[in-house]
């Protein structure tokens, strides 16, 4: 019997490819996705850019995926972290860790095209796209999924990779814990008068964190957080006003901000499932947890989930175990628990730490940034998580 994956965004598509590679096509996978990846309306493969940590790129290379993404990626050679209006900062450089890059920035629409090209020829993978789940039945020994096309699939384990507030997981009785941050993330691609040269920036401002990631064609991908109550004001700004405000918040490290492209915005919250497994069902990626974009940890955490689950399922199959058995799924959950809790905790703490303008706390966090800049062991702690070198 097979693995049935619902959701063909980054997490679901990568999981299908990982299982195919690790099992050499011996473990059948059905991947169900409602929207063709070529569509600009695809919610998982839109115009956004994401940063893949070096550790994530290494894992993608291991399963033969990175080789197809490398030509559309932009290397991050330096990360500069600072607190606006204060002296504290820390810089991470790839050369300090004998690396060519700390990570890579990719545009999701480009990634979607390449992942689905790989999926169409991956041994053991059957694509059901575009198609949707009409009904799910879970029995003691298997799962049965009926598609809107009328086809019925039978498998040992069901994977929810259908994003935040997963409809599949909800239908399977999973509860959610959510903490709204009362913040809005504004996303745009911007142009600057000074070349980024692979530099990425994380800047904490009075309104919220601001990240600039290097992209192709000299552009930068911007994620700029604002209090939720400023939504109407920020979204009403003209291009010129937006660039002026961004210049004031970001500074002149990349010279003049000359252009801002189409802007989109969404509210931010920490959302995570109370449990990542239930009867013959596993949650991965944003279906398991959706984090604040601060420090770019969410997607890389999801990729560690994906790789660990692929290994757990293929190992169970090799041993002749029922891979949907609760004991097998518990092994996966226990394996991921420490990293998941730590990453959620660190990300959530950073949001609250840098949102607080209480003077003693501001002084303390700037001392912390300066300490990391001056003392290599302290800086290495930040680097390990930035690089995605985290035990799975």
Swiss-Prot record:
Record Gene3D superfamilies: FAD/NAD(P)-binding domain
Keywords: Cytoplasm, FAD, Flavoprotein, Monooxygenase, Oxidoreductase, Ubiquinone biosynthesis
GO molecular function terms listed in the Swiss-Prot or TrEMBL record: 2-octaprenyl-6-methoxyphenol hydroxylase activity; FAD binding
GO terms (BP aspect): response to light stimulus; response to oxidative stress; ubiquinone biosynthetic process
The EC number(s) this enzyme carries: 1.14.13.-
Consequence of gene loss (knockout): Cells lacking this gene are photosensitive and are not able to grow with a nonfermentable source of carbon. They also fail to produce ubiquinone, and accumulate 2-octaprenylphenol and 2-octaprenyl-6-methoxyphenol.
Names of the cofactor(s): FAD
A Pfam family reported for this protein in Swiss-Prot or TrEMBL: FAD_binding_3
SUPFAM superfamilies for this protein: FAD/NAD(P)-binding domain (SSF51905)
Pathway assignment: Cofactor biosynthesis; ubiquinone biosynthesis
Location of this chain's protein in the cell: Cytoplasm
Record GO cellular component, one term: cytoplasm
Job description of the protein: Is likely an oxygenase that introduces the hydroxyl group at carbon four of 2-octaprenyl-6-methoxyphenol resulting in the formation of 2-octaprenyl-6-methoxy-1,4-benzoquinol.
Family named by the database record: Belongs to the UbiH/COQ6 family.
Assembly notes: Component of the Ubi complex metabolon, which regroups five ubiquinone biosynthesis proteins (UbiE, UbiF, UbiG, UbiH and UbiI) and two accessory factors (UbiK and the lipid-binding protein UbiJ).
Name of the protein in its database record: 2-octaprenyl-6-methoxyphenol hydroxylase
Native species: Escherichia coli (strain K12)
Species classification: Bacteria, Pseudomonadati, Pseudomonadota, Gammaproteobacteria, Enterobacterales
